[in-house]
Amino acid sequence: KPGLRYEQTIQRVKYIVGPGENFHTNFSDLVPSVSLGMKIGKTQNIRAGYNMRIWRPGIWNLNPYFDDQNPMFISQGNPDLKSEKSHAFDVAYSSFSAKFNVNVSLRHSFNNNGIERISRLITAEDGEDFGGGHIAPHGALYSTYDNIGKNRNTGLSLYLNWNASPKTRIYVNGRGSYTDMKSEAQGLHNYGWNGSFYGGIQHTLPLKLRLSLNGGGSTPYISLQGKGSGYQYYGLSLNRSFLKEDRLSVNLYCNNIFEKYRSYNNHTEGANFVSKSSSKWPSRSFGVSVSYRIGELKASVKKAARSISNDDVKGGGGGGNAGGGGGQ
């Protein structure tokens, strides 16, 4: 089954108050895809396919604002960035039954114009002039973005859902991949393994109480000039529905209850520098949520198969030492 679609995104950014440089972008992309499927039993099938995935630069990547709040760690976006085009080939196996749902997928993707964050040390004794009265002093670390990455990624993912009993459900979602990244223009090369895991248990207790326990984590991610932080999390929730047709739901939850703060570390290397940063953010949370459902969805009303999702924006960015320019 072949497919082809056209996508266009137009952005116009204008500063009304405060310093900043107005900019606009226009992204136009043709996105092809091909998929093949074959059933090998009543509940099993194999699928193979190719698709192009478009990653458009986010506002932090594009914003040319010269962020020198910390004069020794300066960041600036690049409004001339192009869409990152990633080509992916995958083979997947799935099996479904009343007890088990399994999906295993092998995927290889590559791109030759990856949007990468590039950092370099200002070595000129008098600093470096970036125009508009913006000068980075000697010894400062200057970071921006460019379409310079050549990325190769091969990964294996697994999803398993087990209905252990009429009242108990156990699910696991895991992924492992190997990434090779390089920029010949900058003379940079990095590679490594990355993995993530997510799982949980849901159990229905007496009095229509639903207990959920979930957790997961990831190993450090690989970037062109270093690596970032891994993470782990866990949570517990207790849910109960009330009133006719269970319209009112009350949920008690707690997350990372034994961890008040979490540290995030970043390691970046260049030809003449090594930069390490660490930050702490609140991790523990707990609370109560209440929701009430108004109206009724009739069985004859078909729900929309898809909804608009803005999931094609390149991740990363932020203020200060973490990302591109952020207007003030």
Language model region names:
Residues 1-20, 27-33, 37, 42-87, 108-138, 162, 255-271, ...:
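Surface-exposed extracellular loop regions of Gram-negative outer-membrane beta-barrel proteins
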Residues 6, 34-38, 91-95, 106, ...:
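Residues on the lipid-exposed face of transmembrane beta-strands in outer-membrane beta-barrel proteins
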Residues 6-12, 50-56, 65, 95-97, ...:
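Transmembrane beta-strands of outer-membrane beta-barrel pores
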Residues 43-46, 99-102, 166-170, 207-213, ...:
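Repeated loop/turn-to-beta-strand initiation elements of outer-membrane beta-barrel proteins
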Residues 76-78, 82, 97, 101-173, ...:
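Outer membrane beta-barrel strand-and-loop segments of large Gram-negative receptors
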Residues 242-328:
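C-terminal beta-signal and adjacent terminal beta-strands/loops
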